[in-house]
Amino acid sequence: MTLKDLNIGETAVVGTVGGEGALRQHFLDMGLIPGEKVTLVKFAPMGDPMELSIHGYELTLRLDDAARSWVTLAKAPAAKKAEAESEKPVEHPGLGEGGRYHTKKGENPLPDGTTLTFALAGNQNCGKTTLFNQLTGSNQHVGNFPGVTVDRKSGAIRNNPDTEVTDLPGIYSMSPYTSEEIVTRQFIIGEKPTGIINIVDATNIERNLYLTMQLMELDTPMVLALNMMDEMRGNGGTVRINKMEAMLGIPVVPISAAKNEGVDELVDHALHVAKYQERPGRMDLCGEEDHGGAVHRCIHGIIHLIEDHAKAAGIPVRFAATKLVEGDQRIEAALKLDQNEKEMIEHIIVQMEQERGLDRAAAIADMRFHFIHQLVEQTVVKPRQSKEQLRSARIDQFLTGRYTAIPAFVGIMALVFYLTFGVIGLALQNLLEVGIDALTAAMDSTLTAWNVNAAVHSLVIDGIFTGVGSVLSFLPIIVTLFFFLSLLEDTGYMARVAFVMDKLLRRIGLSGRSIVPMLIGFGCTVPGVMASRTLPSERDRKMTILLTPFMSCSAKLPIYSLFAAAFFPEHAALVMVSLYFLGIAVGILMAILLKGTVFKGEAVPFVMELPNYRLPGLKNVVQLLWEKARDFLQRAFTVIFAATIIIWFLQSFDLRLSLTADPQQSILAWLASGIAPLFAPLGFADWRVSTALITGFMAKESVVSTLTILYGSSAAFAAALSPAAAAPLLVFCLLYTPCIAAVASVKRELGGKWAFIMVANQCIVAWLAAFGTRLIMML
């Protein structure tokens, strides 16, 4: 019997785990090991993938993986006895505290003035970034989707200038499966921080502690932060901190990062262990008597063989030994073992497999989880079922239900766009426009009264106020869109969307996880491209990155608003929503084309955690909105301001650098006329339009300011083009190359070759789509 054969609600025990390579290692690291209980929770609305419950959290898996290679199932064992609460109290070990762990005489602190560097490491979605913000005062994006931190961020701990803490992408183990996991592993092993702050979700402690076991093997000063303890206590659970600290040999501090509880104590312990280089008191997780001692003898035999190699490579020997058993090729290459040593190690591992009755990777995973089970049984009093889990289950009945999930997704996205473009965002935009118009009129009157030079007057009013002001008026719409997208992410709904849409996206060659970078792309292409790092497959990453720019970013909203109001005022909201769906449709067609040509093959297995729904914190939402507004304002007063000044200058002066009142005699007209013929078949061969498209490569918002400056006003622009020409131009703006910042992010992720291919491809697609629109409008 395989995992696929389970019925909803049935529980069984894992017999064997199939698969191979990094994928199988990832399954083991996620807790799917022989002897572990697993429960089928439900299937996705389209029947695939499935949702499993293991170690107290939810995991997704596709049916073909379950049927082909996952498990054989045995009879479920009897339930374990409840944790005892009546054990004798354990004296506080005092790890990470002065005068308790070591004597004054035995101290060997780092020199004063040494910068203490910390790696903030933990599983995805455990609250790392929230803790980072509390530690440093930085304003990193806080979300509720696995992989919010897609690059490492650093900052000094408050009131401790000689420190640097780095927020690393979340990982489940030190066996890298995705590019973000590689970032974390390379930092911890390669840059050797003076200390590690390991944050653990106390409500999901078994799965989180798996990474802790591996971090302890690095022999780096370390403190364990038990996050979300307020939730655990609120559900009737608790953790015997003293006992856990004694068993692990590292300081354990209960905290609530969201409420800033226990953070000061955590900082004190972290500074102490780093300053005095107090290393973990325990690294050996398997005793000589555990399962006959097979794994213990294997690891220690390998340690004896590779000790000199590990020291030369700068890799902790215990960590190197366990990774060699798991078959980690990167570690093996770094150790530079000769052939004889490799054969001896292989002989030791094979003997262990025979004695233990498990393959090498499963034996190491079992060793860690066996210790975790012992630790949890002695230190954790679990609640029967948390309020957060019950609430999530009730919400999921509707949002991931068989008949309700797709309508719910469509309805939610439609509501987001309607409120953004038709109600809240529009009302705020109109209000801001009134203020900008009043300020412009007042400045115009002031400059006239002061008899300011005509050129300067034109620069200030026609260039700065008209150009930048027209872009600023769209700030409310952009902020409103980001507000709703952040709500979807913070609550945990984004992860459900990936679960619901996986089967559909597989048909066009993508994974369900690809939906999240593309949804983020509706806000801005740059973070959407960066979010693709959460995808484990290079193929999936490239496809997702190339498709994300087809999701219309918020910077294009000013263009849509201008065109819709000028040419289609009676159907403005419909036109704007239709553009979004057109971008999605073109992206789907491109995905199908790429799947059949450049990126042949299937998407990688869909393995992802489904976090509990959480109410977004008001502070986090306001913080995110401020970041987006600030970013937009910075762009408005830097890139867009500079582009506006340049456009004004090129428009106001001729080739002899003489001020001209005739725009057709300007330098700008001469430059733009060179590419204008390319757009003649599309119905807009006007040099002013060509100029706007060029400036749009710098920043999409510049298209509006450029058109407003060159035509003099929105009304003049509306009079210059017919709807039959405006529609193709609108489609071209939707689909042509993203801004320079987005292109730079693609270059950073995939290299210059793919960035150029993306720009060329989108320009060609945009031209063809605009030409088709022109033909339709001429009917």
What are these regions (language model features)?
Residues 232-285:
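Canonical P-loop GTPase G-domain recognition
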Residues 408-419, 481-486, 564-566, 579-593, ...:
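Hydrophobic core segments of alpha-helical transmembrane domains in multi-pass membrane transport
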